[in-house]
Amino acid sequence: MENVINVWEEYGLTRSWNNPKLDIQRKANTQKDLFFVGVFSNKIIATAMFGYDGHRGWLNYFAVLPQFQKSGFGKQLLEFGELLLVDKGCPKLNLQIRANNKEAINFYKAVGYNEDEVISFGKRLIED
């Protein structure tokens, strides 16, 4: 668990209002078959937390350690998750990116994702 969180922290995904250990535990209780890590030389270098609610797929905590970015690991992990979602009948995969994360925006555009004309809303139901 700590190795996964280290990837998230190094990539800058963790936030003070989200407890990453609780997020991992919650995912382990819900569609744990859609939570993946990428490993290179026995070290976790990438993570992806996919989900499917019967209408849309979602991707969270997608991260690749900086020293392994632009090497194809992220694309390979993303495509693997996409194939699993297609097998489950998922017609579309959605994800959210912080507006200032230009590298992620460029990555997703390069692998065929388009910006949707939507506004994202959220409401915290359980405090971490």
Each model region followed by its residue ranges:
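Residue-level recognition of specific faces of alpha-helices
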Residues: 58-61, 96, 107
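Conserved active-site tyrosine of GNAT-family acetyltransferases
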Residues: 108, 113
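Charged catalytic carboxylate motif
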Residues: 3, 76, 103
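Conserved acetyl-CoA pyrophosphate-binding loop and the N-cap/start of the following alpha-helix
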Residues: 68, 72-80
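Conserved GNAT acetyl-CoA-binding A-motif
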Residues: 78, 85-97
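Acetyl-CoA-dependent GNAT
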Residues: 1-61, 65, 80, 84, ...
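Conserved beta-strand-loop-alpha-helix junction that forms the acyl-donor binding cleft
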Residues: 95-104, 122-127
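Active-site acidic-Proline motif in GNAT/NAT acetyltransferases
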Residues: 65-71, 99-100
